[in-house]
Design a protein with these regions (language model features):
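N-terminal charged helix/coil linker that caps or initiates catalytic domains
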Residues: 1-6, 11
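Glycine/GP-enriched mid-protein hinge/lid loop-to-helix segment characteristic of carbohydrate kinases
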Residues: 5, 19-21, 31-32, 44, ...
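Conserved Rossmann-like nucleotide-cofactor binding loop
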Residues: 14
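N-terminal phosphate-binding loop and adjacent alpha-helix
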Residues: 29-65, 215-218
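Glycine-rich phosphate-binding loop and adjoining helix at the ATP-binding site
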Residues: 40-52, 66-70, 76-137
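Amphipathic, non-transmembrane alpha-helical scaffold segments
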Residues: 48, 221-227
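Glycine-rich beta-strand-to-loop/alpha-helix junction loops that act as flexible
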Residues: 70-76, 143-145, 227
């Protein structure tokens, strides 16, 4: 079978990571991994520059291999068919932007060869495949800057049906008068930490750094249960 190489890209609220993948056997090509940290609340220019840096670094490690396309795992809400950012609360500076066109511009890969899927769905389908496809049904959950979910039913990614929430999503599921992601995500840690200390942080790492530096250590230990 002919080797077919594509870029596998994971975009999250704090980073972009990419690696060359051989679709003929779904293997990762060693020494092609690239990652750049960038927060989702930055300006569109900063975010896109970070993405471009990671993609070009990965492509530079391809050692002359022809890259046929890009597969992008992207958090919801996002128009995965058109490749357009839709979120107000995450990557807000990118809302309405055609991400497919932007990625094509910086990589030279045709827009028609750039595909998107939900990041949690990509995780769930990958886990199902690596598990040897032994189980007919699987639920995958991702916890990070957001709260993602993937439902595998009879070996297929499902977004509707018995036991599957609308769109196959849990992040916007009603919970305690708000949505689940407000409680099960980085955003909740940031909000609760500010309530307990009066100090704003960005990301859980910021909270850990303060704790390791000794600041708020006593308060954090005393407040751990209510946190």
């Amino acid at each position: 079978m002919e080797d077919i190489y594509v870029l596998g890209v994971d975009i999250g609220g704090s980073h972009i990571a990419c690696q060359l993948v051989n679709l003929s056997d779904c293997s990762l090509i060693e020494n092609t991994y690239a990652e750049v940290k960038v927060a989702e609340n930055q300006s569109a220019g900063i975010i896109l520059a970070a993405w471009e840096k990671a993609l070009k670094e990965c492509m530079g490690k391809a050692a002359g291999k022809i890259i046929r396309g890009i597969g992008v795992a992207m958090p919801s809400p996002f128009d995965f068919v058109q490749g357009i950012a839709m979120a107000d609360h995450k990557f807000a500076s990118l809302k309405g932007l055609n991400i497919r066109q932007e990625l094509s511009r910086v990589t030279g890969i045709l827009p028609s060869s750039i595909l998107f899927t939900n990041d949690a769905a990509a995780f769930g389908m990958g886990a199902w495949r690596l598990n040897g496809s032994r189980d007919r049904h699987l639920i995958g959950v991702t916890l990070g800057t957001g709260f993602g979910a993937c439902f595998i039913v009879d070996g297929c990614y499902a977004t509707y049906g018995p036991g599957v929430p609308i769109g196959g999503e849990l992040w916007n599921y009603p919970f305690r008068g708000v949505i689940a992601e407000d409680y099960v995500s980085t955003r909740w840690f940031e909000k609760r930490f500010a309530e307990l200390t009066g100090e704003a942080i960005h990301g859980v790492k910021g909270m850990i750094d303060l704790y390791q530096a000794g600041k708020y250590k006593t308060e954090t230990e005393r407040s751990w249960c209510p946190l």
